[in-house]
Amino acid sequence: DLADLDALLGPRTRWVAMTHASNVLGTLNDVRAVADRVHAAGARLAVDGVAYAPHRLPDVAASGADVYVFSFYKVFGPHYAVMAVERELLLSLPGLNHFFIAQDDMPYKLQPGNVNFELSYGAAGIPDYLDAAAAHHGLSGSVREQRQAAVGLFAAQEDALSQHLLDYLRGKRGVRVIGRDCV
């Protein structure tokens, strides 16, 4: 509830961290609404998208998040992660590397070791997979629209399966489903 957030924000608030979606219930949180409130309070917002990205295509810019993270292995890729950070914030972060690596020497200042090239290359297959799914289903529009629509097809299938499960559970004697009455 956003009113609960408003009660927690104050002049000493510097950061708010949240999930984009519940890993347990799949509840989707309105990141943009939270970002607007957090920024109005003079704080920054970090969003964990690990439970959202496998089911919807994140739009980090539209979300208003200052930091957005998720794991590629959750979206058909290797065991690797991505962290999207607005540039000015990224430049202000202290480096993890040697002292002689400049603060603006990106991405090296945040790489305490060598990049795993195999994993990096493996992540390049994710857009190919989404493009193949879009082509298979004859989806049209811009590349982003096609990928969004492909992920939307995945989500629709998941929702149908989840609804089937919820309907089954609600019909079982001795089972009580607690939470929102939707998928």
Task: Give the role of each language-model region.
Residues 1-183:
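Pyridoxal 5′-phosphate
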